[in-house]
Amino acid sequence: MKIYFGTYTKRSSEGVYVADFDANTGELSNLELLIKENNPTYLSFAKDGALYTVGATEAGGGIAAYDANAQLLNHVVEEGAPLCYVAVDEDRGLVYGANYHKGQVLVYKRQADGSLVLADQVKHIGSGPHENQASAHAHYADLTPDKYLVACDLGCDKIFTYKVDSDGQLEALASYQSTPGAGPRHLAFHPTAKIAYLMCELNSTIEVLIYDGLGHFELMQTISTLPEDHTGFNGTAAIRVSNDGQFVYASNRGHDSIAVFKVLGDASLELVEIVSSHGKTPRDFILSPDNQFLIVAHQDSDNVTVFSRNVENGKLTEISHDFQVPEAVCVLF
């Protein structure tokens, strides 16, 4: 099967890459440049094969739309820094983006050919106590299981939820205040329980949230992603939940590790292990479709690590860490 990598293009990378992944052995091979683009740091596929990236142009940042053959459809750009997150809403025919530097959430309408037109945008206002929280920093914009739009804002320690109509117009619904200085980055929902796991970048924690199904979140538990004796820099990055809802995985940049948690009966978390990611700055990772493997992309060491996964206890065993992908910061199937 094919596996895709989004990258920074500050050093040697040229854009979006694709490789072959052997679902039986976990072996990676045949890396190829799929799309030449500046800093396509996050990617999202539509079911029809269209690909959306947050790559930048000389005119500014935005979202680029490509067809199933990786041919550019259009690039919706506005002045300023590029976006950091993109997601597809199949039911409404929309695409969502998050702009970290501007604190914006953007909504685009998909056209018949898959190209995009900007439909709406909102700008968050706020700040936090950490030095990286001088202003709002939207880092994630995606759907709840009941189809509200939820946005994590690292700058003002909040989750915002919005109603979205069929035209992509947003209506503010609710907000959740995380621990001051936590820096909410990404959110992952449990597949069956009314629970969400909030990845907090700045204090290296996961906040386990009760989700009432109407856009409202309530804190149930806070748990660290680091060993108790770690005192150096760390910023968490990606979070994933296994398909069976039994385990949660989180990446640490700085400690350069993957934290493994067991989901208990009430959906709270218990640490299982923290394993080296065998690279520098594991900004993103993904579970293979059958959840037998976990694949980690490293931004600063240009390598990809493949772990096999014990589905009974969640533990990871490294298979390889020598497949080279330059400046990889996003990985998806």
Language-model segment annotations:
Residues 8-10, 56-58, 100-102, 110, ...:
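Short loop/turn segments immediately following the C-termini of beta-strands
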